[in-house]
Amino acid sequence: MVNIPKTRNTYCKGKECRKHTQHKVTQYKAGKASLYAQGKRRYDRKQSGYGGQTKQIFHKKAKTTKKVVLRLECVKCKVKMQLALKRCKHFELGGDKKQKGQALQF
């Protein structure tokens, strides 16, 4: 299990800062896919009408986890950057710290 604190002191690339400052940490989440992207428009046009499924649907999934991406926002200048972590099954943001002799809880 990976437990990350909600704030982190790290280097800020913003023009005002360019030094180590406090950053607010959140987990990156993919945005909603646009209906007007060229690939989606082409796919919808091809799918319309008779003839069933026209493109292959991918089934051979190989990975069991995704890489965790952190979104760091500078508290002073509000510049945002992303930081990729390694793959993990359990990810927690701002959870309780581990204590010695305690059982793991999911």
Curated annotation (Swiss-Prot):
It comes from the Eukaryota. The keyword Ribosomal protein applies. PROSITE patterns: RIBOSOMAL_L44E. SUPFAM superfamilies: Zn-binding ribosomal proteins. Gene3D superfamilies: 3.10.450.80. It holds the Pfam family Ribosomal_L44. Keywords: Ribonucleoprotein, Ribosomal protein. GO terms for cellular component: cytosolic large ribosomal subunit. GO terms for biological process: translation. GO terms for molecular function: structural constituent of ribosome. Belongs to the eukaryotic ribosomal protein eL42 family. This is Large ribosomal subunit protein eL42. It comes from Yarrowia lipolytica (strain CLIB 122 / E 150) (Yeast).
